[in-house]
């Protein structure tokens, strides 16, 4: 996992403090840094992907079922992270079947049915 983050940090000029902050914000700690991503749990993989977005300073996050594989507290932490990202002018596109949670996070909503937009609000 550390190599993955270091690669992206190099690409954008992020330093060790920014990597550590991204890991903390994503709910990860240094104990997992030597673990290969393929050996991580589903929730840890999602958190690693979020840490990469944070290190990359991505202006757009495309999250497909981001709450899958997370326990209830992990889902709440992810929601907090999404809210912080949006407050920092990050655009978040969230694809989810959890409509209640998505609506609580959304500034705008688009429903897709059969591959076409069926509702926009």
For every predicted segment, state its role.
Residues 50:
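Hydrophobic anchor residue at the start of the ABC signature
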Residues 67-68:
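Short loop immediately C-terminal to the Walker-B catalytic DE motif
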